Amino acid sequence: MDNAGKEREAVQLMAEAEKRVKASHSFLRGLFGGNTRIEEACEMYTRAANMFKMAKNWSAAGNAFCQAAKLHMQLQSKHDSATSFVDAGNAYKKADPQEAINCLNAAIDIYTDMGRFTIAAKHHITIAEIYETELVDIEKAIAHYEQSADYYKGEESNSSANKCLLKVAAYAAQLEQYQKAIEIFEQIGANTMDNPLLKYSAKDYFFKAALCHFIVDELNAKLALEKYEEMFPAFTDSRECKLLKKLLEAHEEQNSEAYTEAVKEFDSISRLDQWLTTMLLRIKKSIQGDGEGDGDLK
């Protein structure tokens, strides 16, 4: 069956499902077997949704899954309703990001009501990713990553919570909310430095926190660096700590060339990602004579 044939069959199933729903509302049907009609309609909406999916008509698939979700709720089948809302969200993601968010929020409401916070957290991440990539609303992405982290923490899933919080910190710094970013990086650094499996990552978190301090104030960065070395002696021998000391020296001397050279040397061994490059450029622009710089670190 080609896509047009699948769509035709899906439309017929939708019409049949609507008839079942209307029939369930009549007085006698309501007394005798109204729920059976609604269950049949649920099944038809779901079949229609899957036919629309095969035909790649994502909006129609999302709508059909939504109809099924509402009927499942009418039947007090909370789990099935939430599952259908998630299916609707996944279909809408390909055609209507805002509607996808609405459906996922509906699923989250059901899951939190059922005490299923880990699943709710997962769907908050999906919403955050839609805001990141499709709708480009970073403030809203941050809010959903924070909510996800809260739910994960409540369920003692600290590793998953930290992943979300690191996203929050990275975006907060991009939006120049440096204090918020610093607090998160420091907290996660402190939590990981005593864990034999995770302590290697602690230096990265302290490095990022120090860069945020540096953008705000050079003295803050110096004091923070001393604090991190005291808290986590292994940080002193790290390439990140050595780079920070070189950058502080170059900044104090207002030496743009020395600053660039230190960054180049670090980058030749550990490639700088986009976030680090952005933060290092912001610091470089505060060196006198660099003006707005040439937008380059190399």
From Swiss-Prot:
<dbReference type="GO" id="GO:0006886">
    <property type="term" value="P:intracellular protein transport"/>
</dbReference>
<dbReference type="GO" id="GO:0035249">
    <property type="term" value="P:synaptic transmission, glutamatergic"/>
</dbReference>
<dbReference type="GO" id="GO:0070044">
    <property type="term" value="C:synaptobrevin 2-SNAP-25-syntaxin-1a complex"/>
</dbReference>
<dbReference type="InterPro" id="IPR011990">
    <property type="entry name" value="TPR-like_helical_dom_sf"/>
</dbReference>
<dbReference type="GO" id="GO:0045202">
    <property type="term" value="C:synapse"/>
</dbReference>
<dbReference type="GO" id="GO:0035494">
    <property type="term" value="P:SNARE complex disassembly"/>
</dbReference>
<protein>
    <recommendedName>
        <fullName>Beta-soluble NSF attachment protein</fullName>
    </recommendedName>
</protein>
<comment type="similarity">
    <text>Belongs to the SNAP family.</text>
</comment>
<keyword id="KW-0931">ER-Golgi transport</keyword>
<keyword id="KW-0813">Transport</keyword>
<comment type="subunit">
    <text>Interacts with PRKCABP, and disrupts the interaction between GRIA2 and PRKCABP, leading to the internalization of GRIA2.</text>
</comment>
<dbReference type="Pfam" id="PF14938">
    <property type="entry name" value="SNAP"/>
</dbReference>
<dbReference type="GO" id="GO:0019905">
    <property type="term" value="F:syntaxin binding"/>
</dbReference>
<dbReference type="InterPro" id="IPR000744">
    <property type="entry name" value="NSF_attach"/>
</dbReference>
<comment type="function">
    <text>Required for vesicular transport between the endoplasmic reticulum and the Golgi apparatus.</text>
</comment>
<keyword id="KW-0472">Membrane</keyword>
<dbReference type="GO" id="GO:0010807">
    <property type="term" value="P:regulation of synaptic vesicle priming"/>
</dbReference>
<dbReference type="GO" id="GO:0005483">
    <property type="term" value="F:soluble NSF attachment protein activity"/>
</dbReference>
<keyword id="KW-0653">Protein transport</keyword>
